[in-house]
UniProtKB/Swiss-Prot annotation:
Gene: purA
SUPFAM superfamilies, alphabetized: P-loop containing nucleoside triphosphate hydrolases
InterPro entries to which the protein is assigned, alphabetical: Adenylosuccin_syn_GTP-bd, Adenylosuccin_syn_Lys_AS, Adenylosuccinate_synth_dom1, Adenylosuccinate_synth_dom2, Adenylosuccinate_synth_dom3, Adenylosuccinate_synthetase, P-loop_NTPase
Keyword Signal belongs to the record: no
Quaternary structure and interacting proteins, as annotated: Homodimer.
Protein name, UniProt field: Adenylosuccinate synthetase
Family to which the UniProt record says this protein belongs: Belongs to the adenylosuccinate synthetase family.
Domain of life, per lineage: Bacteria
GO biological process, one term: IMP metabolic process
């Protein structure tokens, strides 16, 4: 008898990242047999809290915390082998089995030390030239994607062939060292401790990069795989898969607040291209959104509040929400919920349902403001514009909703939420036109309200 094909869910961030995707992916993996990362690199940070223990992941899919769940890093991810093994070793010290459950696509482009050097040097050059920084993490993500698009990247599969790897590495170093020294003036830069072992007189050294890559090659070989083939086979055999997005829709290189974006497509459609499955295998798109908005780094943010002034709503969000980046440690900018922004995210992702996270952070605020549109150059609009310049000119149009004083922390029954909290959530549904499937009421895995299970929804 032929097996029933599995049901697959895509989880994407709908704002500027940091929406709490890691917790929800971990929660959903109770119904999944495989979890897939399909874009980004170790610039993304996911925090999981299980039985009070906090775990931060950057590359490895969040499903690794569920025993028996297979984890896949798809071809759309740019891979730092050094950071991957750093993460693996940290998990193994905590008693988590990783290597026998992790598969890495041979088509992943590699992030190498010269990519990080380029990233750091470019941001420094922008700052010295008086240009606003993009706000990258400095981890080489953008330069690695540039090499991929230019068809010159070293990929995971190249690690299997040392001579070929060495030839391509010399070619890349000739190009990138020229840019570092002669265009960006790297001889005048002081690189951080992580890069110093690879750099001499502003240039990245071949031997240091090659020797480390060959050490990683031996460790990585048992995990190398044709991820596309494995995912399609698992689906055909009835496995449920979960595709885990990184960053958020408004950081998407095409649909975000360009140029203040990441270097990959963060939207749901890239789950197919970034892992090697057909779009027909993506059955439910779950959009994760905070009950307010945050953003790290530069770029327009229409509903931003003064989050540094004590006693203000923005300060409340920042402090109660512990709004610091998992990857960078930078403080996140905070602001009111933007439903017009979410409508844009719903449009480009084709959202099936929403998960609202950090509802508990809003406990105690007397009044909440909900952005339902903007005034742009004298005209009222109800959808986030495409261009960063236009977004910067948008003045939010707010609706006022009363806050609540009762705690929502740990609530798992929708009907037990304060009446005004339910009113707030219902208004978000009305304005965006997307049903709420789940609500998170603390970082803990079990503090989740379920209205519609994405794996059961039809």
């Amino acid at each position: 008898m032929k097996a029933t094909k599995g049901r697959n869910v895509v989880v994407v961030g709908t704002q500027w990242g940091d929406e709490g995707k890691g917790k929800l992916v971990d929660w959903l993996t109770e119904s999944a047999q495989g979890v897939v990362r399909f874009q980004g690199g170790h610039n993304a940070g996911h925090t999981l809290v299980i039985n009070g223990v906090k775990t931060a992941l950057h590359l490895i899919p969040s499903g690794i915390m569920r025993p028996g769940v297979k984890c896949y890093i798809g071809n759309g991810v740019v891979l730092s082998a050094a950071k991957l093994f750093e993460e693996i070793e940290g998990l193994e010290k905590a008693g988590v089995q990783v290597r026998d459950r992790l598969r890495v696509s041979e088509a992943c482009p590699l992030i190498l030390p010269f990519h990080s050097a380029l990233d750091v040097a470019r941001e420094a050059a922008r700052e010295q030239g008086g240009t606003e920084k993009i706000g990258t993490t400095g981890r080489g993500i953008g330069p690695a994607y540039e090499d991929k698009i230019a068809r010159r990247a070293l990929r995971v599969q190249d690690l299997k062939y040392p001579e070929r790897f060495a030839t391509k590495l010399r070619e890349l170093l000739a190009l990138h060292n020229h840019i570092l020294v002669n265009v960006l003036g790297s001889k005048n830069f002081t690189f951080g401790d992580a890069l110093k072992p690879y750099i001499k007189d502003g240039e990245v050294q071949f031997d240091a990069v090659y020797e480390e890559a060959m050490r990683h090659a031996e460790l990585l070989k048992p995990m190398m795989a044709d991820v596309s083939r494995e995912l399609n086979a698992a689906h055909a055999e009835g496995a449920n898969l979960l595709f885990e997005g990184a960053q958020g829709t408004l950081l998407d290189v095409d649909h975000g607040t360009y140029p203040y974006v990441t270097s990959s497509n963060c939207v749901a459609g890239n789950a197919a291209a970034g892992s090697g499955v057909g779009p027909g295998m993506l059955h439910y798109i779950l959009g994760i959104t905070k009950a307010y908005c945050t953003r790290v780094g530069g770029g327009p943010f229409p509903t931003e509040l003064d989050w540094e002034k004590e006693g203000t709503p923005g300060w409340h969000m920042s402090t109660v929400g512990a709004e610091k980046g998992v990857t960078t440690g930078r403080s996140r900018r905070c602001g009111w919920f933007d439903a017009a922004l979410l409508k844009r995210s719903a449009q480009v992702n084709g959202l099936s349902g929403l998960c609202i996270t950090k509802l508990d952070v809003l406990d105690g605020l007397q009044e909440l403001l909900l952005c339902v549109g903007y005034e742009l150059d004298g005209e009222k609009i109800d959808l986030l514009p495409m261009g960063a310049d236009e977004i910067a000119r948008c003045k939010p149009i707010y609706e006022s909703i009363p806050g609540w004083t009762d705690s929502t922390v740990g609530v798992t029954d929708y009907d037990k939420l304060p009446a005004n909290a339910r009113r707030y959530l219902e208004r978000i549904e009305e304005v965006t036109g997307v049903p709420i499937a789940m609500v998170s009421t603390s970082p803990d895995r079990d503090h989740t309200i379920l209205m519609q299970n994405p794996y059961a929804a039809q």
